[in-house]
């Protein structure tokens, strides 16, 4: 019996595939211990980032149906 492909559930919650084939991700360090971080630092952590090309294969392997 063939192995059933499944998405990595942790990766499915963290990455979204874009129309051009890349993956969006949220930046880290914005969940807790925010009082010591400056407003400027928190502002720069807000926008979504793209997954680096070196990690693209790893993420796409974890999300076979994305």
Swiss-Prot record:
| Transmembrane intervals | none
Sorted keywords for this record are:
Ribonucleoprotein, Ribosomal protein
Q: Sorted alphabetically, which PROSITE patterns does this protein's record hold?
A: RIBOSOMAL_L35
A Gene Ontology biological process term: translation
Which portions of the sequence form the region Disordered? 1-22
Q: What GO molecular function annotation could you give as one example from this UniProt entry? A: structural constituent of ribosome
Q: Where on the tree of life does the source sit, at the highest rank?
A: Bacteria
An example of a Gene Ontology cellular component annotation for this protein is: cytosolic large ribosomal subunit
> Can you tell me which family this protein belongs to?
Belongs to the bacterial ribosomal protein bL35 family.
Q: What is this protein called?
A: Large ribosomal subunit protein bL35
């Amino acid at each position: 019996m063939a192995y059933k492909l499944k998405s990595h559930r942790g990766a499915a919650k963290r990455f979204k595939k874009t129309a051009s084939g890349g993956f969006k991700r949220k930046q880290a360090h914005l969940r807790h211990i925010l009082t010591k971080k400056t407003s400027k630092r928190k502002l720069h952590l807000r926008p979504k980032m793209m997954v680096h090309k070196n990690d693209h294969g790893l993420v796409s392997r974890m999300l076979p149906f994305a």
